[in-house]
Regions:
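Active-site environment of divalent metal-dependent phosphoester hydrolases
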Residues: 110, 150-152, 423-424, 445-450, ...
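Membrane-interface helix/helix-cap signal primarily in integral membrane proteins
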Residues: 1-101, 427, 436, 458, ...
Length: 622
């Protein structure tokens, strides 16, 4: 569908739920979602909107974003078409590097488009007054052509207020322009106040206009600019250029830090992850944005010219590929993006800090800044060591919905047995303060045990991936690609007798005893987990989805255990009374049960008879 297009369809309507997505949709005026079964009528947009929508589709077709990553990026920044960015996984790459703002059409893109139009009008000899009005009107067409993102609308309204102020003989004032833009947009569409793009755009611009000069002064106080005398090794003709380059770098870094600090809370609460390399990545990739957008716009304007259009598009494609390559390098850095769990009230912290800073406005002092920086670093190191290094030995059954994910930790070491069904695993690990994994063991290849590998890849650094013997050659194409992203090409295999050690834990593989393909429950890797000795130790049996026929083969090797992870979610065939008696469970057996495969009463009865301290944990699908 294109902007302005309408459909009449027959389908099933689902009202908003009470989860975060439902609350967000309701706040934006969305009543619910409809799954269309059949489209009966379709009306294309008419008038100016229809013309601009057709022009946009023509520009996207000319760029051909499906032809490569560079073309996909061009379509995103020139025409606001991000379909191929998402399809090719580039949206996640830019997000991990903290550069999502580069692919979202915003004020920087509009400023370049406006400068291009005004430059063309200047070359045509149009007088100053009419030139400003014409440039403003023509640049306004860029906004609907990019599907009217809130950030671009905000930027154009600010530009219009600035042009109007200059026409009236008044100097520009960014906070006033931002206030006018925000007020007009909220009055025309109150629901836009709940749009994330609008919130991030307003926060960034407000912070830059209020604290940008202060941030530059602070950086100058912390890292004093080099004088010409200190540039003795630099050739004299290059010294002015080096000084200018230093000012430019400090200015860009200050702007990036201000934007990052003002929006991190909203981003963390909304997405559950924070980029740690954003300011440095912006410093390296940001200077390429202006030539990339300019080359893309000129290439689209001259697309009809046989040779010139193709040449300019090739140049823009090359620049875009360079941007993608640099972004991938930053996204691939360890801990470039960290999963976090942040309460919603944290969104107020940047506002409180900003108000205090405006009220006090302390003069930047190098000595004070150094002391504050060292103190903050010491506190950060202490918190890091407490949360991520000095961790007691534990085994945790993670809440990931309809699937299995068991976390084993001892100090700074962590291992995950199965990854759950989808993208809940990173949030679950964040709740446990896990930044990295020594290894992941996948018991078998069912989706409710492997679905989280895609979410882990690129976000949680992982040392090794283990599967059952013979399974590494049977991985489905998509899962194999995700596994390569997670640990590279080296995937280990486990068979009966192998051991995996993690801190004080030892995990002995009891099953499989022969080559499998991992496609069946009986192919599940079964692990006997032990820690310590005697009454102070722990013995736990992890069975994946293995059922009673597999337990018959390994129960004699297990002996007494403290904890049993019941196979196949406690199904009817997961355990029989004889096996429960032989295992002699001491205190509890965590079980995951779903609506489609519930914990059977017979299994419950056997477990309660075998383990007086039995507890069952159910997770119901919605």
């Amino acid at each position: 569908m294109t902007r302005g297009e309408r459909l009449r369809a027959i389908g099933r309507f689902s009202p908003n739920g009470s989860d975060d997505w439902g609350v967000s949709s309701r706040s934006q005026g969305i009543a619910g979602r409809m799954r269309a079964v059949r489209i009966t009528e379709r009306w294309h947009a008419g008038g100016v909107v229809g013309v601009l929508a057709g022009l946009r589709e023509g520009v996207v077709a000319r760029i051909a974003p499906e032809r490569g990553e560079g073309r996909a990026l061009l379509a995103g920044i020139v025409a606001g078409d991000r379909r191929e960015l998402k399809a090719q996984g580039l949206s996640d790459v830019f997000s991990a590097a903290g550069l999502s703002h580069l692919v979202a059409v915003s004020g920087a893109h509009l400023a370049i488009a406006h400068a291009l139009v005004e430059g063309l009008l200047l070359c045509a000899g149009v007088p100053c007054g009419p030139r400003r009005v014409l440039a403003l009107g023509l640049s306004a067409l860029f906004v609907p052509m990019c599907s009217c993102p809130a950030s671009a609308v905000r930027a154009w309204v600010m530009l219009a207020s600035s042009v109007a102020g200059k026409g009236a003989g008044r100097r520009g004032h960014a906070p006033s322009g931002l206030a006018i833009a925000g007020s007009l947009m909220c009055l025309s569409d109150p629901f836009c106040a709940c749009d994330l793009g609008f919130q991030l755009s307003m926060l960034s611009v407000a912070s830059l206009s209020l604290f940008g000069p202060y941030a530059r002064a602070t950086l100058n106080a912390l890292i004093a600019p080099r004088t010409y005398r200190e540039m003795r090794l630099t050739p004299r003709p290059l010294r002015p250029h080096m000084a200018k380059l230093g000012r430019s770098v400090r200015s860009s870094l200050a702007a990036s830090l201000v934007c990052q600090l003002s929006t991190w809370a909203v981003v963390a609460v909304t997405f559950g992850r924070v980029s740690t390399v954003g300011p440095i990545a912006s410093l390296a990739v940001g200077p390429l944005l202006s030539p990339l957008v300019l080359a893309g716009l000129v290439a689209c304007l001259l697309a009809a010219v046989p040779v010139v259009g193709g040449l300019l598009l090739a140049v823009a494609d090359g620049l875009a590929c360079l941007v993608v390559a640099l972004t991938r390098q930053f996204a691939a850095l360890p801990f470039s993006s960290v999963a976090v769990v942040v309460p919603r009230w944290v969104e107020l912290l940047p506002i409180i800090v900003a108000l205090l800073l405006l009220a006090l406005w302390p003069r930047p002092s190098r000595r004070v800044l150094a002391r504050v920086s060292l103190g903050g670093l010491a506190v950060a190191i202490a918190i890091f060591v407490r949360l991520y290094v000095l961790v007691p030995a534990s085994v945790t059954v993670l809440d990931v919905g309809q699937g299995d994910a068991i976390l084993v930790r001892d100090g700074p070491h962590a291992l995950l047995v199965d990854t759950g069904p989808g993208d809940a695993i990173t949030d679950a690990l964040a709740r446990q303060h896990v930044l990295w994994l020594d290894a992941v063991i996948v018991t078998h290849l069912h989706d409710d045990h492997t679905g989280g590998i895609d979410d882990l890849a690129g976000l949680v650094p992982t040392g090794s991936l283990y599967v059952g013997e013979g399974v590494s050659g049977s991985l489905p194409e998509g899962l194999g690609r995700d596994a390569d992203r997670l640990v590279g090409s080296g995937i280990g295999e486990l068979c009966a007798g192998d051991e995996v050690r993690l801190g004080g834990f030892t995990m002995t593989c009891l099953w499989p005893r022969e080559v499998t393909d991992g496609s069946e429950n009986e192919d599940s890797v079964c692990l006997l987990l032990t820690y310590g000795e005697g009454g102070a130790g722990l013995r736990m049996l992890l069975t994946g989805d293995a059922e009673s026929n597999v337990l018959d083969s390994i129960v004699s090797q297990v002996g007494d255990i403290d904890v049993l992870k019941v196979g196949h979610h406690g199904s009817r065939v997961s355990l029989d009374g004889g096996q429960a008696a032989v295992l002699r469970l001491r205190w509890q057996a965590p079980v995951r049960a779903t609506r489609t495969d519930t914990l059977r009463p017979s299994a419950l009865r056997r477990l309660r008879e075998a383990a007086p301290g039995f507890c069952a944990r159910r997770t119901m699908a919605t």
